[in-house]
């Protein structure tokens, strides 16, 4: 077993086994060693070919030129694996042949590279960081711009499994906050099975479909104009007639090839369909949910967990994306097979990707934050095992069908935030979602009216949570087009409040109105757009206390202010200005007057690691605990309490401001 730890020295540790029956290989020409067409296979000796005949292809990472091979007749001792490695490493055409890790639950292969993600504390200077990396023999490939003192580094060739020991030793360095090897897994898009009933009430084949998201009605108020939706996927046919309008395409990028041309590969149909669902113009054959939005196509076909993955979010944020749609994630289990081990595998979110998402959320839209959505998944399994879709700062989108109930494959769990219409398989009233397809007969539709249109420019059978996610992303764009001043979490809250509670019997909604299958329900686009504009302004009073109160190690400091108003509270915002050199040491609480009968409300709970200072406004969306103060009389003494829970760093409370609406 080897171990990897995400979240720093105190983060969760994940165990990975060394496979006895897999090898990973890369050829000099990037050609495959195993092919259905022998003349296309990489040239190797007869001895190597004989050993390869005992293996079969497990998975291929095409862009890296790497493939994972599996022994046809598995053993327990790894003898054939080791013999194959020895023979193949002597072949001139073979760049390397190495061991492979497997997830002990799902038995899925995981490839480790000789690269590491390393993040030092905020206070360390560059020369010190470089000195530490040099001490471990590491070469800096890139200093990462999305997190302070973060590096993508490589170990010397043939480091092999020792890369895990290096990562653990680095984590024991006092100056290192985060460190993990670059682990890559099979990357799967969120698609399942095979006219735009999801946008409005529609009659198809004599059947009236009413299971829509009320999108067409929302267009009277907003069509997405002024917003940009980033589609991170396998590329987009940017020459498609529904994307050809002037200025439609913004900042295209291929993070895998490192070019600005996100052209799909020969079999890459997924991204074009997703883009069509989100923001197709609707001028020729299919409208997106937000037809007025601009499209930022980002092609990402590298492996799950790679540095390219993190780069996708940074590119989107730096180039003006408002909304980021991700219809991909870890491999799903077979939705109808409850014995599939993939159902139980837990795939963590790498720190490198998490920090890139945080960068988009904290820095995107001039600090208001990009809205990030993920497809919940198509395995009929728990989304909570998927570290990507279950990350607390993203919106996980489930799928509901044309009957207004759960799509059979759709993942479920506590992380599901909302649902959007998609296909179902059987039974179904429609083939699926009608959307843009790669132009001509090269996409999902080979040129048949049974599959879409005769020209092959549109498909009628897109589906899965792959389709639900960009649909919800389009609604987020409608919201921001109506009110561009909203923060990312306010958009998420509006989506929550807009949802229609479908399937009341089968939805298993709890007391808070949340379902494991639909989250808060099926998005209602019209309601969401109506909620985007604030209600009529209410009388507001602002109360401020300014005083430099020292924050000493392992002590608690307080700053108080008195409020005399006796009107019931309708809304509240709390702004704090705290200077400190390591905010991960701090717990910050607001203590209302005792007469309110409300317990202290935690505003900040040791998050942020070694970052400096807390200058932030908290409201009922970002801090739901503040809702307990609605209807209370504010008269009395309010106290900001700051508890320092670790040694070495100090600071001071500068000010406290409380804004009350009456």
Curated annotation (Swiss-Prot):
Subcellular location: Cytoplasm
Domain Peptidase S8, chain residue ranges per copy: 196-529
Lineage top rank: taxon: Bacteria
Family: Belongs to the peptidase S8 family.
Function as written in the Swiss-Prot or TrEMBL entry: Degrades phycobiliproteins in vitro. Has a substrate specificity similar to that of trypsin.
Protein name listed in UniProt: Calcium-dependent protease
One Pfam family per UniProt: P_proprotein
UniProt keyword terms in alphabetical order: Calcium, Cytoplasm, Hydrolase, Protease, Serine protease, Zymogen
